[in-house]
Regions:
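His/Glu-rich zincin catalytic helix
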Residues: 1-108, 121-126, 132, 136, ...
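Histidine-acidic residue clusters that define the catalytic metal-binding segment
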Residues: 15-40, 180-220, 250-256, 381, ...
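A common structural junction motif
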Residues: 138-147, 241-248, 355-364, 456-460
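Non-catalytic accessory/assembly modules
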Residues: 5-9, 150, 380
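Generic structural signal for individual residues within well-ordered alpha-helical segments
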Residues: 99, 153, 200, 208, ...
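M16 family metallopeptidases and their MPP-like homologs
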Residues: 51, 56-86, 95-142, 156, ...
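Short, polar/flexible loop-turn hinges at active-site or ligand-entry regions and domain interfaces
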Residues: 89-92, 142-150
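Short conserved segment of the HATPase_c
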Residues: 167
């Protein structure tokens, strides 16, 4: 015991960026950066999370707004279109001048819109001569976009072309139908980018009104990581916050109601059939997340060796990949299982997947499966804060979902302490094999029986998966 404690102390005392020997690593997780998260609020009400990281002369800034498609109201696609238009124009600069402005400083601007959130991000060198002009331009783009009319037409056309492309993609069609069935009239039901009908009618006035409301400082979380002092970080956060519209945080959407279980088929002329199975999962505040995350890792969250992959691909050759995932969101996000298989084997494959889920819920994981999943988690966990980019993403999520600052460490400790019974209980509390909403997309063809399981399946998945 004392020996182990001494070894642990010597490892802990050594800086995290020094090399570890292979002997030291044997059976243990690699060392990971301990995050010293500093936090405060700006005068306008934005929440700020900051980690000082001096290794490289650069910094990452990520501003997260509760401005995703769940805030679209009756206008699907409004949030996505607003976000896409941010860097299309500011006073005195069009989209090309903005891009050249960032590029000339060696800076990267990024933006994105999802169901819960919209994001604007900046990566820049930290020297004052590069940092200050990059931040000035970023503050204008995020806080004072001009929404030029010609750009709106161009981006609408790009989105409309995307919708046309989606019609040729059975996976996209199935995914859209699945969210519609799973969420009904809830704001999560419609696609983040809206539809051809809704996008066409969106006006500049609607974009400006949405930006003024949803891109307000009170509705923002500012995450900063990099080569900055606390004083510099405070100045950056104050500058960004002051440049945003004034206003409060927007309310989260209501919790969704449980959907009606059942199967919907979309007829599509393809060789393969897409199978999507889902039910409502959890929100990001749910205390069962560590148990569900580990339980899902064993079911279908990893690559080879999961219950689903072993039975469906390795023993029967029915698919290239079958995956399950919980997506916790502001309110209950989906639990999903996705795969593609030969059209003539689709009904049998669907039943097999349902049986695997039912059996897993009934029996729970084995001790060996749980131990392996814990070891895999411990090995991959350091990657969650190995780079500034990954840290700034974690900070953004912690701030946006109002998680404890120790959330990453807590998650790891709670996961490693879980028992087989706790994982089984959590999976059964949140999932039920007979409550699945199922969407399939593919041709109607005569069905064949599934091959028997074997170590060397004679069936091979068809070609490259269709997307």
């Amino acid at each position: 015991m004392a020996d182990n404690a001494a070894k642990a102390d010597s490892t802990a005392a050594r800086p995290a960026n020094t090399l570890q020997s292979l002997a030291e690593l044997d059976g243990k997780a690699p060392s990971r950066r301990q995050l010293n998260i500093q936090h405060w609020n700006t005068a306008e009400g934005a929440r700020v999370l900051f980690v000082e990281a001096r290794e490289l002369p650069m910094f990452d800034l990520r501003v997260t707004f509760a401005a995703g498609s769940s805030q679209d109201g009756g206008t699907p696609g409004l949030a996505a279109l607003t976000n896409a238009m941010l860097n299309e124009g500011v006073a005195g600069k069009d989209v090309t001048a903005i891009a050249e402005g960032f590029e000339g400083l060696g800076a990267d601007f990024g933006n994105g819109s999802y169901r819960d959130m919209a994001v604007a991000s900046l990566r820049s060198l930290s020297t004052k001569d590069k940092r200050e002009p990059a931040l000035k331009l970023f503050a204008e783009v995020a806080g004072k976009p001009t929404f030029p009319e010609d750009a709106l037409k161009r981006i609408k056309n790009q989105m409309l072309a995307g919708f046309e492309y989606d019609k040729q993609n059975p996976g996209k069609l199935a995914g859209k139908a699945l969210f519609g069935k799973l969420y009904g009239d809830h704001p999560y039901a419609h696609p983040s980018d809206g539809s051809a009908e809704s996008i066409n009618g969106i006006t500049l006035a609607q974009l400006r009104a949405f930006h003024a409301k949803a891109y307000s400082a009170g509705n923002a979380v500012i995450a900063l990581v990099g080569d900055l002092s606390r004083a510099e970080a405070e100045a950056i956060a104050a500058q960004v916050s002051a440049g945003l519209p004034k206003g409060p945080a927007l309310a989260a959407p209501a919790q969704p109601t449980d959907p009606k279980a059942g199967l919907t088929h979309i007829d599509f002329p393809s060789k393969q059939t897409h199978l999507m199975l889902a039910e409502l999962g959890i929100d990001r505040q749910d205390p069962d997340w560590p148990a569900l995350s580990l339980g899902n890792q064993i079911l279908g969250g990893g690559a080879f060796g999961t219950r689903l992959m072993s039975e469906v691909r390795e023993k029967r050759g029915l698919t290239y990949g079958v995956y399950s995932v919980f997506s916790p969101m502001q309110v209950r996000g989906p639990f999903m299982i996705n795969l593609q298989t030969r059209a003539e084997l689709s009904e049998g494959t669907l039943k097999l997947v349902q049986d695997i889920l039912a059996d897993y819920l009934k029996s729970g994981p084995t001790q060996q499966e749980l131990d392996d999943a814990k070891r895999e988690l411990a090995g991959s966990f350091p990657l969650s804060n190995a780079s500034n980019a990954s840290i700034v993403g974690q900070l953004g999520a912690i701030g946006f979902y109002n998680l404890p600052l120790t959330w990453l460490e807590d998650f790891m400790q709670q996961s490693q302490a879980l028992t087989v019974e706790q994982v089984k209980a959590a999976m059964n509390k949140h999932l039920s094999a007979d409550k699945l909403v199922i969407v399939t997309a593919g041709p109607k063809v005569p069905q064949k029986p599934l091959p028997a399981p074997t170590d060397k399946p004679s069936e091979h998945p068809l070609g490259v998966p269709e997307h």
